[in-house]
Amino acid sequence: PDNIMVVGGHLDSWDLADGSHDDGAGVVQSMEALHIFKRLGYKPKNTIRVVLFMNEENGGRGGKKYAELAKTNNENHIFALESDSGGFSPRGFSIEADDANFQRISSWKNLFEPYLIHSFVKGGAGADINPLSSGKIVKAGLKPDSQRYFDYHHTQTDTFDKVNERELKLGAAAMTALTYLIDKYGLE
Protein backbone atom coordinates (compact mmCIF):
# COMPACT_ATOMS: atom_id res chain seq x y z
CA PRO A 1 0.00 0.00 0.00
CA ASP A 2 1.04 3.57 -0.75
CA ASN A 3 0.39 5.07 2.69
CA ILE A 4 3.00 4.40 5.36
CA MET A 5 2.57 4.06 9.10
CA VAL A 6 5.77 4.06 11.17
CA VAL A 7 6.24 2.44 14.57
CA GLY A 8 9.63 2.96 16.15
CA GLY A 9 12.17 3.58 18.86
CA HIS A 10 15.89 4.35 18.94
CA LEU A 11 18.79 1.91 19.11
CA ASP A 12 21.42 4.11 20.72
CA SER A 13 21.82 4.72 24.45
CA TRP A 14 24.14 6.37 26.92
CA ASP A 15 27.31 4.42 27.60
CA LEU A 16 26.66 3.99 31.32
CA ALA A 17 24.51 0.89 30.72
CA ASP A 18 22.81 -1.02 27.94
CA GLY A 19 19.84 1.36 27.75
CA SER A 20 17.10 -1.18 28.35
CA HIS A 21 14.46 1.42 29.20
CA ASP A 22 15.99 4.19 27.04
CA ASP A 23 15.32 2.89 24.50
CA GLY A 24 15.64 -0.86 24.25
CA ALA A 25 12.04 -1.07 25.41
CA GLY A 26 10.83 1.10 22.53
CA VAL A 27 12.76 -1.00 20.02
CA VAL A 28 11.30 -4.26 21.37
CA GLN A 29 7.76 -2.85 21.60
CA SER A 30 7.91 -1.62 18.00
CA MET A 31 9.08 -4.96 16.66
CA GLU A 32 6.53 -6.77 18.82
CA ALA A 33 3.73 -4.69 17.30
CA LEU A 34 4.49 -6.16 13.87
CA HIS A 35 4.88 -9.60 15.42
CA ILE A 36 1.40 -9.32 16.96
CA PHE A 37 -0.11 -8.34 13.60
CA LYS A 38 1.61 -11.31 11.97
CA ARG A 39 0.44 -13.76 14.67
CA LEU A 40 -3.12 -12.49 14.27
CA GLY A 41 -2.96 -12.85 10.49
CA TYR A 42 -3.93 -9.20 10.12
CA LYS A 43 -3.61 -7.77 6.61
CA PRO A 44 -3.17 -4.00 6.95
CA LYS A 45 -4.65 -1.47 4.53
CA ASN A 46 -1.48 0.61 4.83
CA THR A 47 2.21 -0.25 4.94
CA ILE A 48 3.23 -0.63 8.59
CA ARG A 49 6.96 -0.12 8.94
CA VAL A 50 9.15 -0.55 12.00
CA VAL A 51 11.98 1.98 12.08
CA LEU A 52 14.82 1.61 14.56
CA PHE A 53 16.37 5.06 14.67
CA MET A 54 20.00 5.82 15.47
CA ASN A 55 21.66 8.82 17.12
CA GLU A 56 18.62 10.06 19.05
CA GLU A 57 20.75 10.69 22.13
CA ASN A 58 23.27 12.87 20.32
CA GLY A 59 21.57 15.03 17.73
CA GLY A 60 18.68 13.00 16.35
CA ARG A 61 20.39 12.42 13.04
CA GLY A 62 18.64 9.07 12.47
CA GLY A 63 15.18 10.66 12.57
CA LYS A 64 16.33 13.55 10.39
CA LYS A 65 17.85 11.19 7.81
CA TYR A 66 14.75 9.00 7.76
CA ALA A 67 12.55 12.06 7.11
CA GLU A 68 14.95 13.24 4.40
CA LEU A 69 14.81 9.86 2.65
CA ALA A 70 11.02 9.72 2.97
CA LYS A 71 10.78 13.09 1.24
CA THR A 72 13.32 12.13 -1.46
CA ASN A 73 11.38 8.92 -2.16
CA ASN A 74 8.02 10.74 -2.18
CA GLU A 75 6.68 8.48 0.56
CA ASN A 76 3.32 9.35 2.04
CA HIS A 77 3.51 8.88 5.80
CA ILE A 78 0.09 9.16 7.41
CA PHE A 79 0.99 8.07 10.96
CA ALA A 80 4.08 7.69 13.13
CA LEU A 81 4.21 6.24 16.64
CA GLU A 82 7.26 6.36 18.87
CA SER A 83 8.05 4.67 22.16
CA ASP A 84 10.86 6.42 24.04
CA SER A 85 9.77 6.74 27.67
CA GLY A 86 10.64 3.37 29.14
CA GLY A 87 9.07 -0.06 29.26
CA PHE A 88 6.63 0.60 32.06
CA SER A 89 2.84 0.08 32.06
CA PRO A 90 1.21 2.14 29.32
CA ARG A 91 -0.95 5.02 30.48
CA GLY A 92 -1.78 6.78 27.22
CA PHE A 93 -0.50 8.65 24.21
CA SER A 94 0.64 12.16 23.42
CA ILE A 95 -0.72 13.11 20.03
CA GLU A 96 0.42 15.66 17.46
CA ALA A 97 -2.53 16.15 15.14
CA ASP A 98 -5.01 18.68 13.88
CA ASP A 99 -8.20 18.99 15.92
CA ALA A 100 -10.23 16.59 13.76
CA ASN A 101 -7.68 13.78 14.00
CA PHE A 102 -7.05 14.39 17.68
CA GLN A 103 -10.81 14.05 18.30
CA ARG A 104 -10.96 10.90 16.17
CA ILE A 105 -8.15 9.22 18.11
CA SER A 106 -9.56 10.44 21.42
CA SER A 107 -12.91 8.85 20.51
CA TRP A 108 -11.21 5.45 20.89
CA LYS A 109 -10.08 6.23 24.43
CA ASN A 110 -12.93 4.16 25.91
CA LEU A 111 -11.45 1.06 24.26
CA PHE A 112 -8.20 1.57 26.19
CA GLU A 113 -9.59 2.68 29.57
CA PRO A 114 -10.35 -0.84 30.91
CA TYR A 115 -6.58 -1.41 30.73
CA LEU A 116 -5.82 1.82 32.64
CA ILE A 117 -4.68 3.55 29.45
CA HIS A 118 -6.53 6.80 29.92
CA SER A 119 -4.35 9.77 28.99
CA PHE A 120 -4.86 10.99 25.42
CA VAL A 121 -3.34 14.46 25.28
CA LYS A 122 -2.12 16.87 22.64
CA GLY A 123 1.62 17.20 22.75
CA GLY A 124 4.99 16.18 21.42
CA ALA A 125 5.19 12.68 20.06
CA GLY A 126 8.91 12.02 20.01
CA ALA A 127 12.29 13.27 18.87
CA ASP A 128 12.82 10.60 16.20
CA ILE A 129 9.51 11.05 14.41
CA ASN A 130 9.37 14.82 14.87
CA PRO A 131 11.18 15.54 11.56
CA LEU A 132 8.47 13.71 9.57
CA SER A 133 6.19 16.34 8.13
CA SER A 134 4.67 14.92 4.96
CA GLY A 135 1.07 15.94 4.30
CA LYS A 136 -1.29 15.65 7.24
CA ILE A 137 0.77 13.12 9.17
CA VAL A 138 -0.45 12.31 12.66
CA LYS A 139 2.25 11.54 15.22
CA ALA A 140 1.90 9.90 18.61
CA GLY A 141 4.13 8.93 21.50
CA LEU A 142 3.43 6.08 23.90
CA LYS A 143 3.24 7.45 27.44
CA PRO A 144 3.96 4.81 30.08
CA ASP A 145 3.75 5.26 33.83
CA SER A 146 6.65 7.60 34.56
CA GLN A 147 7.03 7.09 38.31
CA ARG A 148 10.27 5.06 38.05
CA TYR A 149 11.62 6.22 34.69
CA PHE A 150 14.16 8.66 36.07
CA ASP A 151 15.50 6.00 38.45
CA TYR A 152 17.00 4.47 35.28
CA HIS A 153 17.10 7.17 32.59
CA HIS A 154 20.72 7.81 31.48
CA THR A 155 22.14 5.92 34.48
CA GLN A 156 24.18 2.79 35.07
CA THR A 157 21.02 1.09 36.36
CA ASP A 158 19.27 1.15 32.94
CA THR A 159 19.80 -2.57 32.45
CA PHE A 160 17.75 -5.50 31.17
CA ASP A 161 16.95 -6.86 34.63
CA LYS A 162 15.06 -3.62 35.43
CA VAL A 163 12.48 -4.17 32.67
CA ASN A 164 9.28 -5.95 33.69
CA GLU A 165 8.29 -8.33 30.89
CA ARG A 166 4.55 -7.94 31.49
CA GLU A 167 4.71 -4.13 31.43
CA LEU A 168 6.81 -4.26 28.26
CA LYS A 169 4.22 -6.49 26.59
CA LEU A 170 1.37 -4.21 27.67
CA GLY A 171 3.13 -1.28 26.00
CA ALA A 172 3.55 -3.27 22.80
CA ALA A 173 -0.12 -4.24 22.91
CA ALA A 174 -1.18 -0.61 23.36
CA MET A 175 0.96 0.46 20.41
CA THR A 176 -0.47 -2.35 18.31
CA ALA A 177 -4.04 -1.42 19.24
CA LEU A 178 -3.64 2.25 18.31
CA THR A 179 -1.89 1.35 15.05
CA TYR A 180 -4.67 -1.14 14.25
CA LEU A 181 -7.45 1.38 14.89
CA ILE A 182 -5.83 3.97 12.66
CA ASP A 183 -5.12 1.42 9.94
CA LYS A 184 -8.63 -0.06 10.01
CA TYR A 185 -10.73 3.07 10.50
CA GLY A 186 -8.46 5.73 9.02
CA LEU A 187 -7.83 9.34 9.85
CA GLU A 188 -9.67 12.51 8.88
What annotation goes with each model-predicted range?
Residues M5-V7, V51, F79-L81, V138-L142:
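Hydrophobic/aromatic beta-strand patches that form the interior of the parallel beta-sheet core
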Residues S13-R104, D128:
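Acidic/histidine-rich catalytic neighborhood of metal-dependent amide-processing enzymes
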Residues F88-E188:
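Active-site-adjacent substrate-binding region
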